[in-house]
Amino acid sequence: MSAAWPGGAELPTEPVGSLPRPSVLQRAVLDAEIGQISAAELERAQEAAVRDTLDRFAETGSPLVSDGEQRRQSFSSYPLGTAPHDGGVEAGPVFAVFADGHHRVIPSLARGPFRFRGWAADDVARSRRLTSRPLKQAVISPSMLSLMVPAEGLGDYSRAEFLDDVVAGCAEDIRRCFAAGASRVSIDFTEGRLALREDLRAPWAGPEALGGFIELINRVLAELPNELRAAVGVHTCPGNDNDSAHSADVDYAELIPELFQIEAGYFLVQSASEKDPDSVARLVGRQLRHLARSGERSAPRVLLGVTNPTSPKLETAEEIRDRLVQAARFIPAELLGSTDDCGFSPYLIDEKPRHGSPDFARDVAFAKIAARVRGTELASEELAGRSTGSQSYAGYGATGTAVVLP
């Protein structure tokens, strides 16, 4: 069942999803693939990693905890099940080329129809047995799944039929998460920013793709009752794999206005690793002001990224406090919150080269989460002590000049 947002001046904070897998788990996965260990031994390694993750999350004081996707191969592959090739899935075209030169591919559906063979709710249910704390769960987007089938479809299985199946599956995935005990769910939408990057090495990408992605996500959200939709977020970032991004060079000014056409309950927006984090808050504030003036729908909450998962440099609680207080110049405090820029390791096998090892990266991740939690508390206290007067819906234009709403 979804959790209520904090009241008063308290700013919400939550993780995105993934955390670095311990090196022992990464080795166990590789050993299992070549038959060196049994499925039962792999399950024990996964269970140990999940228990450690939940325990260390609790130590940070985080209001919501997560299993850090310790059981997943990647953020995008879990719907394919544990034996995707048995379900007619094969390696497809390039999904993204990262700044360090490595790439990831899109799974390609060899035959229809498409059906979910694994559910995010399975992870929620397992974690629910291990903790009584509120759980956060990340899920795949319909737009990511849409890349598995070409425009011409697969023989008698048309692309329109495929997209109908994707939408139905994604909506069911979210409903199951809440039924299993998740308090909030967010849709990973890393392909949103990447869609605006024209790259011949990733042939699916291009600005024309973004509109179709947004339509698909809205179709999924429309399948959910209002009380659940309010607890469903959409996360955007420029990617994070092996401490490298895939679309950090894409101007946020191109994405943010389009992003807020998605009718989600809240958004998680990467910001800390931007060259100018204030520009992100300013762009977001302008969109919130537009929504308020148009009366189209209630303005959503926005959780800004205040930690950079690609860097081992630790943010302090005081730095995070200052970032949030500064962001409140542009985003109403009652709609503001914090998160991490991205999942810390969206793919299971991740050497975390800038950190030196996945184990050290794991320690760094929990230290960053603890700083985020404490920094958000400090920002809440400081903002609570300020008088907002009649301008609680502070909107600032691109010039930085305050705009008072009528």
Question: What is each residue range found by the language model?
Answer:
Residues 1-406:
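Domain-level signal for soluble alpha/beta catalytic cores
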